[in-house]
Amino acid sequence: MAAALSQGGTAITMKALLEAGVHFGHQTKRWNPKMKPFIFGARNGIYIIDLQKTVGLARNALRFVSDSVAKGGSVLFVGTKKQAQDAIREEASRSGQFFVTNRWLGGTLTNFKTVKQGIDRLKTIEKMAADGTYERLPKKEVAQLEREREKLEKNLGGIKELSRLPSALFVIDTKKEHIAVHEANRLGIPVVAVVDTNCDPEGIDYVIPGNDDAIRSIRLFTGKVAEACIEGKGRYSAWVAEHGGHDERREQEDRDAASERGHKDRRDRRDRRGGPRERREPREDRAAASANVEVVRKGEVAPAAAPEAAPAKE
């Protein structure tokens, strides 16, 4: 597996990183101390990223991406900043993956069922335009549908064919895309990201220290991740063909992931309540207590816990 990556289009070299300006971080006054382990030093008030670490970490990240896709998974590319949009859109499309480039809609992952309704609506309008329905509608209604379609396409076009949650996220600029990272963390979806010196690496499963502002740097890493997806997809296709087209591995992974998300959601709810729920009394004890209350209510006996009246003082 490692050999395939090192010899193919996913190869990461020091020369390529230097030429793309990957080593240039942010000004020293705009840094996140948690990025200190990935910083080589400072020059002219700008932090220089340790490219030796970038090379090793990028290779690990690409290996993970390739293996995830080889198991039948998918990768969601996320980059809404202007200089990242074109690269994210082009490379995700080239590798047959999914992307978000306009803005991250809150709940894209954590409330995927609702987002799926928007996707279904987009497909319905597209079908209406293709099957001639538009021709039977008033022009005003067609114009309204087109405006709705354009808005949905802008926000959901990149995930239109996403039928289930992705196996991984690839993110450019984790500071800007912190909501996407948070949602992935909540669901246990691994995050691969290019992390600059002003970002927080916590919550990122595969940190790639590097410049997340320069277009050449963004294109370099986005292209490498796309190549890893293509390589993994080839292995997946070969595996499915060999096993008669039935993907038991992916089905089992879906079940395991759903189970893990369920456990995590229950733990989160318990933590928000302030700890585990108090143990309830056994059913027999609750029934007995209920009977005692009913007896007291009818006046048959006095409450056992009722204190005696205090004697009057002289």
Curated annotation (Swiss-Prot):
Record-level GO cellular component terms: cytosolic small ribosomal subunit
Name of one Pfam family that matches: Ribosomal_S2
Gene Ontology molecular function: any one: structural constituent of ribosome
Entry superkingdom: Bacteria
Alphabetical UniProt keywords: Ribonucleoprotein, Ribosomal protein
Gene Ontology BP terms: translation
Basic and acidic residues: compositionally biased ranges: 244-265, 271-287
Compositionally skewed regions (Low complexity) per UniProt: 302-314
Record's keyword annotation contains S-adenosyl-L-methionine: no
Region (Disordered): 244-314
HAMAP family to which the protein is assigned, alphabetical: Ribosomal_uS2_B (MF_00291_B)
PANTHER family cross-referenced by the UniProt entry: 30S RIBOSOMAL PROTEIN S2 PROKARYOTIC AND ORGANELLAR, SMALL RIBOSOMAL SUBUNIT PROTEIN US2M
Protein family membership: Belongs to the universal ribosomal protein uS2 family.
Protein name in UniProt: Small ribosomal subunit protein uS2
Originating species: Anaeromyxobacter dehalogenans (strain 2CP-C)
